[in-house]
Amino acid sequence: MHQGTCHCGAVKLTLPSKPEVATACNCSLCRRIGGPWVYFEFGTVQIEGHPENTLEYIQGDKTLRTVRCRTCGCVTHWEPLEPKPGAKHGVHLGNFDPELIASVIVRKFDGANSWKFFDELPSTNESPPQGEA
């Protein structure tokens, strides 16, 4: 198991397995938060210190809450407001050891416009779009 924490240690995350692939998204929220996300089946990530040490942000279509530590402010994860079968937890990989981060392949995702991975889009010489999705 792989464990990580927010900066102050008030929120601890334990992953059920080593992630192989992470996603770097350019949507209006993720590009501000920065860092890659890894995904696991909802309920399989152990989270200590939540909700007592966290604050949440709910925006847009009001289906997800983005969670951060109330002390140090580090974003730790997101979770569905109403988990359904097949729901996922998004975990911010920046809260884990650099060795784990370096071992994970990061795919860039166009959450601002096409809702596809950039490596699946037609090749162009233009810079990736930076919309306000």
Q: What name fits each language-model region?
A:
Residues M1-T5, A10-A133:
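A short Gly-Trp-Pro
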